[in-house]
């Protein structure tokens, strides 16, 4: 066989593995194409497409060993009890396995394709609004609008619009200057977009530039700008945050809920996150709960491919999927923070995972307008960019599916054997998740490469979930039995990893990119460190003091964006003071953390007191 001549070595790609022929013959390969061995023998040089198999992490192997050990103990226990008790134990375990299979079987049922008749279409400012009715609805299917009656919205041709034209959007008592709006949008999409990816950035900006569209509304604009104002270094802009949020809240409640659409749901989610981050937990829980209810009302829990709406574009369908998974993710994270049951369940949905949306060339002109004002928006011109951002979103969704299992299976009353099986099973799933994430999202304590902020945040969230799943029920380390001490060591390892991630994060990034859920991550690690202090080992005590200092400093910086973090920091200090075991240690001057708030000020903040309590059972 005649081989192609080799190109210049400098211009050739170097593969990560040897070619197939060299590997089979166990000879040295220069990993070029073709390699010098194949050229020498005049043979075809072939590189397999499959990536290198990574060795299973130690933690994943240990999790599997825990599961095997549990089932061995379960079988031995079965052998020692009577037949009646055996039947009950087997039935409990069997019910758990069956429920898991039903809950997480993602294969859509054939009946899903017939759900079209349970939708009706409502006109909404020339845009489509879907309203879903289930099989038990009181509205006759014959009265529902058919798909042939749905108007098709076609986007107008892009045209250059002067800045002054945009001011017509704000004919309200409060006037938002275009330059201010532009700067706040730039801050939001550059610093916080990875925490709000249920808002499809590219098409929101396009419709904003056009003055209207299905992915833009004034209440969503003001809600987004209120987040941008929270992270602004300019005090004048920061003071605008409450005003903008109040306007968005009034508009969405007075007008948006009359005929809600995608932007109504997105606005409620943005406002919900903002209110929780400010410490107004009831208001945040209310707004997010309204958004989760809208998911069912708008039929977002059903995959658009199972409808018969041929006029819906791929982008329309993908935005609906992204909105659903955004709601699903926030539902789990908020429920995790509050210790409450989730509102959205996988068994009620057949929505496929979202994907990376294509960048459209027509967006260049709107993006250029933002770039003329500031370089803050320059990163956006790459479209929905950097595959790592989308991969971060997709893998966070998969992690939240495991969190959902933890919330529904672990934190509720069950028999001890089934509860232990659930914990072991979920712990194994978490280890499998961390082992299977893409290479660009991988991180470990020995990583030398530069790591993005989203990767660090994803690993912080993962380790906080490990802590919550395995943390002991008693805060006194000396009262833990051998099994609880083993699981506590898992928590201690994750807490140390979170501290290390924090140190790496703040060396390069600032608090502007931190999500609201960071407060829960930090306090979860702090709780384990406080338990470790009860072990009364001097060497560990010094390390714990340093770790608590790092966490409280991080929360104090985060409080510039999310005020709730300052309450969390004060609560950690209060809990630390209660850990002191001698009058000398109770002396404020001897505390290594150099702040001493009064007890009236830090008695316990209501919004996060569950973090320092045993696992919530509901």
Swiss-Prot record:
Which segment of the chain is annotated as a signal peptide? none
The molecular function terms of the Gene Ontology recorded here are: DNA-binding transcription factor activity, RNA polymerase II-specific; RNA polymerase II cis-regulatory region sequence-specific DNA binding; zinc ion binding
Modification type Phosphoserine: residues: 598
Q: Where does it reside?
A: Nucleus
Gene Ontology biological process terms in this record: DNA-templated transcription; negative regulation of transcription by RNA polymerase II; regulation of nitrogen utilization
Keywords, comma-separated and alphabetical: DNA-binding, Metal-binding, Nucleus, Phosphoprotein, Transcription, Transcription regulation, Zinc
- Annotated DNA-binding residue span(s): 18-47
GO annotation, cellular component aspect = nucleus
Q: Which domain of life is it from?
A: Eukaryota
Name of one Pfam family that matches = Zn_clus
Looking up InterPro entries in the UniProt record yields: Transcr_Regulatory_Elem (IPR051615), Transcription_factor_dom_fun (IPR007219), Zn2-C6_fun-type_DNA-bd_sf (IPR036864), Zn2Cys6_DnaBD (IPR001138)
Q: What is this protein called?
A: Uncharacterized transcriptional regulatory protein C1683.13c
Species for this entry: Schizosaccharomyces pombe (strain 972 / ATCC 24843) (Fission yeast)
């Amino acid at each position: 066989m005649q081989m192609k001549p080799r190109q210049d070595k400098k211009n050739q790609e170097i593969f990560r593995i040897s070619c197939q022929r060299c590997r089979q013959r166990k000879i040295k390969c220069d990993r070029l194409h073709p390699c010098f061995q194949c050229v020498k023998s005049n043979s075809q040089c072939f590189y397999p497409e499959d990536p290198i198999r990574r060795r299973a992490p130690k933690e994943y192997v240990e999790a599997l060993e825990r599961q095997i050990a549990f089932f061995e103990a379960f079988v031995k226990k079965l052998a020692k009890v009577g037949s009646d008790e055996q039947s009950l134990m087997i039935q409990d375990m069997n019910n758990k396995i069956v429920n898991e299979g039903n809950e997480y079987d993602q294969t859509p049922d054939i009946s899903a394709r017939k759900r079209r008749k349970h939708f009706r279409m409502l006109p909404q400012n020339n845009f489509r609004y879907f309203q879903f009715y289930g099989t038990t609805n009181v509205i006759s299917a014959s009265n529902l609008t058919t798909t042939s009656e749905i108007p098709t919205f076609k986007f107008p041709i892009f045209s250059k619009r002067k800045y002054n034209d945009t001011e017509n959007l704000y004919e309200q008592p409060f006037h938002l200057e275009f330059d201010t709006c532009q700067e706040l949008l730039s801050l939001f999409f550059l610093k916080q977009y990875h925490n709000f990816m249920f808002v499809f950035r590219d098409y929101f900006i396009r419709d904003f530039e056009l003055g209207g569209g299905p992915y833009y509304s004034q209440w969503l604009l003001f809600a987004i700008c209120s987040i941008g104002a929270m992270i602004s270094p300019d005090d004048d802009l920061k003071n605008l945050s409450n005003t903008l949020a109040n306007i968005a809240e009034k508009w969405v409640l007075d007008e948006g809920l009359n005929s809600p659409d995608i932007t109504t749901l997105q606005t409620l989610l943005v406002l919900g996150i903002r209110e929780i981050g400010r410490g107004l937990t009831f208001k945040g829980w209310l707004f997010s709960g309204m958004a989760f209810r809208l998911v069912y009302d708008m039929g977002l829990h059903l995959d658009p491919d199972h409808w018969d709406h041929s006029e819906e574009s791929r982008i329309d369908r993908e935005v609906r999927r992204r909105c659903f998974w955004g709601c699903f993710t926030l539902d789990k994270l908020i429920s995790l923070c509050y210790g409450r049951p989730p509102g959205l369940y996988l068994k009620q949905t057949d929505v496929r995972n979202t994907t990376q949306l294509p960048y459209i060339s027509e967006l260049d002109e709107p993006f250029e307008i933002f770039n003329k004002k500031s370089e803050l928006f320059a990163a956006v011109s790459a479209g929905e960019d950097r595959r790592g951002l989308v991969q971060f979103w997709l893998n966070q969704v998969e992690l939240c599916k495991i969190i959902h299992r933890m919330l529904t299976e672990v934190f509720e009353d069950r028999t001890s054997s089934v509860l232990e099986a659930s914990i072991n099973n979920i712990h194994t799933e978490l280890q499998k998740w961390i082992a299977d994430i893409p290479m660009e999202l991988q991180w470990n304590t020995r990583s030398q490469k530069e790591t993005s902020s989203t990767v660090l945040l994803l690993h912080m969230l993962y380790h906080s979930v490990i802590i919550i799943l395995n943390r002991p029920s008693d805060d006194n380390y000396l009262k833990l039995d051998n099994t609880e001490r083993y699981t506590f060591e898992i928590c201690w390892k994750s807490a140390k990893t979170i501290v290390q991630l924090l140190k790496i994060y703040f060396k390069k990034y600032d608090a502007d990119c931190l999500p609201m859920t960071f407060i829960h991550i930090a306090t979860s690690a702090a709780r384990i460190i406080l338990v470790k202090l009860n072990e009364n080992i001097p060497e560990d005590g010094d390390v714990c003091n340093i770790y608590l200092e790092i966490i409280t400093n991080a929360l104090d910086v985060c409080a510039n964006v999310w005020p709730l973090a300052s309450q969390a920091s004060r609560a950690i200090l209060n809990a630390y003071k209660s850990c002191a075991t001698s009058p000398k240690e109770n002396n404020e001057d001897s505390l290594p953390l150099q702040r001493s708030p009064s007890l009236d000020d830090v008695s316990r903040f209501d919004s996060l007191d569950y973090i320092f309590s045993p696992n919530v059972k509901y």
